[in-house]
Amino acid sequence: MHPYDCESLNNRCILSFLYEPLFVVSSENFEASPVLASSYEVSDDGLTTTVHLRPEACFSDGSPLTAQDAAYSLISSRGTVYYGSRLRHVTSIAASDEKTLVLTTDTAYECLPLLLDIPIIKDGSRDEAVPLGSGPYVMDGDTRLVRNTNWWQTAAPIVDFAEVKLTLVEKTSEVRDNFEYENVNLVLTDPNSAAFAGFHNDYELWDARLPIMQYIGYNITSKVFSNYGLRSAITYAIDRDHLATDIMGGFAQPAVLPASPQAPFYDGKLANTYGYNLTKFSQQLESASVEDMDNDGTLDLYVPSLGYAVSVAGTMIVCSSSYQRVEAATEVVNALNALGFKITLKTLELSEFRQALQTGNFDLYYGEIRLSNNFDLTPFFSASGSMCYGGLDDSVMLNLCTQALANNGNSYNLYKRLCERGYITPVLFKNLAVYTTRGSIAHPTDYIDWFLIPPADETAEG
């Protein structure tokens, strides 16, 4: 259960009792607040972020928590199973004194703390099964957490018990049974996962918002979807409210822009401009000279490089490992075909899906990605980016991504061009479900926020 390698949602619940980050990122507004840090400042050029640690912070053994511990932790998290390349723009991490951490980046960053919700461990403890942390509890064997008598914070933890019992399970059905018999009081789960097991006892249900985006991607080298006028029309054809409510069971937020609607730079007015609107869909197709030229019921597009018109047809691929994404992709395909497209949906196993993306063997795809907390889109538009499929590398978009990192007010220009050109079509952002036995815990996301925001997962299938 290492904080950098653990992928189990429920096991990561436990980590919030054992460890603390420099900053916490709220799932309510995607803004960073200090925890182990007391403050930070950014240099005028945006390339250096200096973080000041709380002088009273210490580990559970009573030893001081230093900037060297923080530097070691951030460096150790790079390339791990859970944190991957989250800090890809960070070129240097070093302690300048006992309580001052200095980070340098290869591009200007307005708010690097959005990426610093990584648990801090003791210097030199990376290879330990359960490294020393600074949280309000410590492990006592495999099935019990006890209060950390050296906890540096003066306020009581939100979950204020002398001990927390842990239950070992192997299957989701065992999670369900233990929750229904009240052996377990809290369960964190993805209600749209194939492994989800529903509950039937009396419970309270909370949702936790995430930067996990589902979207439509395109092969812009194809003869049909190379036309950005056609691609940009598709945003108007997607009923995102229907997908979020009926396909996702309400555990999602419809999103026209590639950021959570809760993010401070999500522009609702801009989103409304490109939202579901069949009148605008028809107008955009008309402006792109897309029409049913031979009256066969399928739209046609004149391709200048060919010298003749082709049907607006193609294949959308989706990873078969998620029944929810298959269902959502099916809805998208049906909606487009009802409007004159001729799209075939093809489900592929994970390895086949990845290979098809990498080789460009698709026209469209329905993907899912865990974006970083600042919703950086660089991996889509950099030639070396891990999400750059179907010829998506674009120097103008890459420059706009860089400008958005330097000042999130620049996100407007990035998102406007993305919608106008139809590089990708955002659909929704997923939520997780937090189940608690009634009356046992109040506002559970308050104390588990720091790990509920996943790192960037650079695979389109999530």
Where are these regions (language model features)?
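Gly/Pro-rich hinge or "lid" segments in bacterial periplasmic/extracellular proteins
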Residues: 9, 26-27, 104, 108-165, ...
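N-terminal lobe/hinge region of extracytoplasmic solute-binding protein
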Residues: 1-44, 75, 449
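Ligand-site clamp/hinge motif
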Residues: 151-197, 342-344
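Short, well-ordered beta-strand elements
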Residues: 1, 48-51, 70, 101-103, ...
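Detector for C-terminal structural segments
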Residues: 235-270, 324-333, 357-462
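Periplasmic binding protein-like
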Residues: 62, 179, 316, 337-383
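Append "and occasionally in soluble cytosolic enzymes with long acidic Gly/Pro-rich linkers
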Residues: 146, 227-333
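Aromatic- and charge-enriched surface segment that lines or borders ligand/interaction sites
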Residues: 38-81, 224-226
